[in-house]
């Protein structure tokens, strides 16, 4: 135990250099330059910071080979208890295990908080005489706002979590594949299906807090 403590103290400064403060992700830029002993020790420190029970040597080595050093264009992940270790844009993320909500449809009510699936918070849709305002309070307590045109009389308003296809974001913009839009907005792949999407009937209008689609 004392040896472990001493090792942690010796590595503390190096460790802090690699941690992205705002989201506690691990920057992997210099990881390949470290010895395998140091790699495992830094990874252990990071998991410890998240309050994760210390993984076995085999698990640490699997995370290093299968996640950290996975192919550049892969979306690698490794399960540790109820958490997933993921890599995106050369950073290591730890997330809970998410439920697949890509097929969920929630019919919208106005002026009444709507509970979103899988602990994603609440969405409030407010109508004014000219606009509709969407306010999403996410699971971390952050509020995201989007202003939309009012739906036409008789239009069903839906909240969904998956869309594949093209979107146009400005009057003079081109139709872009939504995957490209998410990439430009730096939204990680696993987060893309956890953002409330507002549809009027079957037409995507908005990803709340991220963009509103320009309708011709």
Show the residue positions of the predicted features:
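AMP-forming adenylation/ATP pyrophosphatase catalytic core
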Residues: 1-216
């Amino acid at each position: 135990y004392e040896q472990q403590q001493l090792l942690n103290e010796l590595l503390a400064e190096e460790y802090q250099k690699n941690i992205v403060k705002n989201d506690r992700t691990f920057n992997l830029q210099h990881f390949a330059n470290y010895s395998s002993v140091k790699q495992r020790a830094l990874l252990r420190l990071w998991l410890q910071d998240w309050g994760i029970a210390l993984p076995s040597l085999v698990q640490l080595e699997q995370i290093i080979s299968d996640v950290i050093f996975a192919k550049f264009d892969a979306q690698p992940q490794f399960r540790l208890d109820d958490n997933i270790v993921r890599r995106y844009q050369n950073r290591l993320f730890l997330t809970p295990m998410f439920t697949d909500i890509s097929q969920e449809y929630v019919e919208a009510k106005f002026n009444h908080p709507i509970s979103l699936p899988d602990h994603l918070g609440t969405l409030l849709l407010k109508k004014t005489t000219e606009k509709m305002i969407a306010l999403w309070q996410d699971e971390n307590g952050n509020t995201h706002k989007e202003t939309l045109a009012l739906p036409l009389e008789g239009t069903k308003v839906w909240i969904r979590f998956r869309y594949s296809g093209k979107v146009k974001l400005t009057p003079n913009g081109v139709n872009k594949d939504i995957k490209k839009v998410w990439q430009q907005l730096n939204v990680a792949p696993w987060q893309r299906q956890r953002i409330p999407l507002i549809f009027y009937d079957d037409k995507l209008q908005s990803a709340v807090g991220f963009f509103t689609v320009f309708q011709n």
